[in-house]
Amino acid sequence: MSFCSFFGGEVFQNHFEPGVYVCAKCSYELFSSHSKYAHSSPWPAFTETIHPDSVTKCPEKNRPEALKVSCGKCGNGLGHEFLNDGPKRGQSRFUIFSSSLKFVPKGKEAAASQGH
């Protein structure tokens, strides 16, 4: 398990429906279901963000392989990016708290962005 504290309630850990994961606070697009994959950690795992500015990154003290990630729009804390720990060589693993995400099913993206 990762060094993050596990709080439980990770509703998106085994959630693999097509769609987009957005920030729970501001609805900014963060991750596509295409980048989500099964991982042994208790948190949802993604390989990449939707936009280059979907998240902001801050080095994790005493952990050169980890970066704290926050929403690139509102600064809401999301979790961590673990460098070179993705499913393929050279990919990152974004380990994200379900409580920081909302899921928008495929085909409803426009309605979700208009509602914000």
UniProtKB/Swiss-Prot annotation:
Its cofactor is Zn(2+). It is an enzyme of class 1 (oxidoreductase). Its main location: cytoplasm. PROSITE patterns: MSRB (PS51790). Binds 1 zinc ion per subunit. Residues 1-106 form the MsrB domain. The keyword Nucleus applies. Keywords: Cytoplasm, Cytoskeleton, Immunity, Innate immunity, Metal-binding, Nucleus, Oxidoreductase, Selenocysteine, Ubl conjugation, Zinc. One of its GO terms (molecular function) is actin binding. Zn(2+) binds at C23, C26, C71, C74. It comes from the Eukaryota. The active site is at U95. It catalyses: L-methionyl-[protein] + [thioredoxin]-disulfide + H2O = L-methionyl-(R)-S-oxide-[protein] + [thioredoxin]-dithiol; [thioredoxin]-disulfide + L-methionine + H2O = L-methionine (R)-S-oxide + [thioredoxin]-dithiol. Belongs to the MsrB Met sulfoxide reductase family. This is Methionine-R-sulfoxide reductase B1. It comes from Mus musculus.
